[in-house]
């Protein structure tokens, strides 16, 4: 029996989907434990790019089960679109994909609330994806939410109507005007609910407990990144769930002492989407080049990601709070061609040099301190072994390992699953 955990160590978009896809053949079960359709996991193989929003990244492999855990929030309409998009691959979703009854549903009015809330903030907006994630988690913690298991109840539509009416009253409190046709949105929602009912709903904590007893191997898949965690991220510019290792326990019902390996995924540089502090953001040519070469656009929102140098202070913090045992570095190929690379090793903070992430990392409080490295010219995308990598990249990797005190086991040199080097 093995339970391992894979999560992002930055502000999301680290490349988790690709690594889950690469590792999937080792596991019987892939289980998503938090988040919703605000984050997309991108996989690329056989020359085709696939973006999954809610469905676990193991869905393309034949011999495993994919679970959507209780910590996930599901938009039935988005989910239906995702399922429809997989139809051409002739996947047996009925046997491969199961959903926790305790996962919460995103209602159309959750999305409307999200839009009204964000619009009301003006310049103080946090950069919400407007997918209804925040309002859904608010209803969850406020004990008002509707869960997947409620679909099986005879009074499901009554429960829906009561909550939707409440949301409409709440929207009126925002001093903004948003245009919507709720009747159309609800028609689409209930049609999607009928499709959702074609899949099996389970008590996922019991299912996973029995799977562990039977010796099955499980990979817990996180969404977004550790610096977006609602407790440990750059609050309030965060998501609404726990994206850290603890979220796997609460989002699946797996005991902490059952988790063996914690795989931490990070980019060779740093990116962020939307608002919020970003100490190593580069506003000059380097950031522009990273965005262009790395194709740094959100897989769900399409927004261009902000780019900058690797922040080791933030990376160490994420490794610490997650108990990471293995690191996997993504997009090493994007840094090819830079004469000089920079890595932030500490901050100047209120007149002192510190090597930890403080409470407030707004630009007026933080100045990154950099160590510089010689870059490399070689194109990495065709390389298949660690020995082939240029010395300068190996020096870069060695420095990160020594600073973070966790080994880098995988180096990604391209988007395709084949462009993955094991160290």
Curated annotation (Swiss-Prot):
Family to which the UniProt record says this protein belongs: Belongs to the adenylosuccinate synthetase family.
Residues the entry annotates as binding IMP: 13-16, 38-41, 129, 143, 224, 239, 303
Gene Ontology CC annotation, any one: cytoplasm
Main location: cytoplasm
Binding-site positions, Mg(2+): 13, 40
PANTHER family per the UniProt record, alphabetical: ADENYLOSUCCINATE SYNTHETASE (PTHR11846:SF0)
Binding site for GTP: 12-18, 40-42, 305, 331-333, 412-414
UniProt key word Metal-binding: yes
Pathway note: Purine metabolism; AMP biosynthesis via de novo pathway; AMP from IMP: step 1/2
Any Pfam family hit: Adenylsucc_synt
Catalytic activity: IMP + L-aspartate + GTP = N(6)-(1,2-dicarboxyethyl)-AMP + GDP + phosphate + 2 H(+)
Function per UniProt: Plays an important role in the de novo pathway of purine nucleotide biosynthesis. Catalyzes the first committed step in the biosynthesis of AMP from IMP.
Subunit description: Homodimer.
PROSITE patterns (alphabetical): ADENYLOSUCCIN_SYN_1, ADENYLOSUCCIN_SYN_2
Active site: 13 (proton acceptor), 41 (proton donor)
Cofactor: Mg(2+)
Protein known as: Adenylosuccinate synthetase
